[in-house]
Amino acid sequence: MPHLLVRGVKPEQLARVSQPLVDELAAICQCGTDNFTIECLQTVGVFAGEVVPSFPFVEVAWFERGDNARDQFAQAVTKHIQALGITEIEVAFTTYSADQYYIEGKRCDRL
């Protein structure tokens, strides 16, 4: 945890930046790199009766770490995706509550 769900980026592109991205994110979140999951979603966009490329979008699901960490996290994701030649990228955060997140059937607020 955190989980990154990425669309509009090819898997082979994302794989190229995945290690340096996770290294930077781990430093921002002050946790190990093994805490991160990155999923590259294969989606198909449609608009005005046409098939179009999906817009580059990253959804981050995590436990809140504050404005500063969130800002740095979004900037790091943006920087690494833009390094692939993708000029436009959006990042959105979904925040989990520890009392509603379970690991191995146990609530995180009770671990």
List where the protein language model places each region.
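Interaction-mediating elements
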Residues: 1-111
